[in-house]
Regions:
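Cysteine-rich micro-motifs
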Residues: 179-192
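Short cysteine-rich clusters marking metal-coordination/redox-active sites
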Residues: 165-169, 186-189
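Short, flexible, mixed-charge glycine/proline-rich loop motifs
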Residues: 150-162, 175-180
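Short functional micro-motifs and their immediate structural scaffolds
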Residues: 173, 194
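Conserved phosphate/anionic-ligand binding catalytic regions in large, soluble enzymes, centered on
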Residues: 10-24, 28
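Short linear interaction segments
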Residues: 195-223
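A structural-propensity feature for long, helix-poor, extended segments
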Residues: 40-84
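Short Cys/His-rich Zn2+-coordinating modules
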Residues: 142-153, 167-172
Length: 223
């Protein structure tokens, strides 16, 4: 099993969110077995916080292999499924940090507003350290709400051909293409957010690409 310091090296720093992801992953692997060599374990994460980096390192579930599935719910909930059995565990964070003092709240507000004074950095570091220590010491039953499940297996990763968008010319995974005005286009162009959409918006405002290039040159000379 991977160690916490390996996860910190991957993520870049230690923080409460990363340590929560570590604890979640340790619990999942204890229940489902060894970390995934390939796609044997599937992780469904309901947030994109620091914790997900720990999940990737600990379980070897990654976006590229298709066994790390992101649900943008903003919830501290993680579900792990074992292939081929469908055995699963759903882990919800139930832990609550100790209440902050008025001074700690003040330091955090100053930090969020951009202050990096020694006083502020020291206070923020101390608070984070206490949270990390609490997460590491708290028992599983007090840290999590657990549900053991049997789940249908998500589809394994598939490789699709790439097709050029007929508006911007960029290669796009075939099932992500859309049809607009009789043309097969990528999602950004379908929604008017792609390169072609930007060009159309510029044209409607009377702005040419030469105007943009000239503005960039002028800005570089001024800097």
């Amino acid at each position: 099993m991977k160690k916490l310091d390996e996860i910190v090296r991957f993520h870049g720093h230690i923080c409460p969110g990363l340590v929560l992801g570590y604890r979640v992953s340790v619990f999942a692997l204890k229940n489902l077995g060894k970390r995934s060599k390939d796609e044997e374990i599937v992780a469904i994460v309901e947030n994109n916080s620091c914790a997900v980096d720990a999940v990737q390192v600990m379980t070897n579930c990654t976006f590229g292999k298709g066994n790390l599935i992101f649900k943008d719910y903003g919830k501290q909930v993680y579900t792990f499924i074992k292939r081929p059995s469908g055995k699963a565990v759903r882990i919800s964070i139930d832990w609550t940090p100790s209440p902050e003092t008025e001074k700690q709240k003040e330091m955090w507000q100053r930090y969020m507003k951009g202050s990096r004074s020694k006083e502020v950095l020291k206070a923020v570091h101390q608070r984070k350290t206490k949270k990390i220590e609490s997460i590491l010491k708290t028992s599983d039953k007090d840290l999590f709400k657990i549900k053991h499940l049997k789940m249908p297996l998500p589809e394994e990763a598939r490789i699709y051909p790439s097709v050029r968008c007929e508006k911007c010319g960029e290669k796009t995974m075939e099932p992500r293409l859309r049809v607009k005005n009789g043309k097969t286009v990528c999602i950004p162009c379908f929604e008017g957010r792609g390169l072609s959409g930007i060009r159309e918006k510029m044209a409607s405002l009377g702005i040419t690409e030469k105007d943009i290039a000239d503005a960039v040159k002028w800005a570089r000379k001024r800097s």
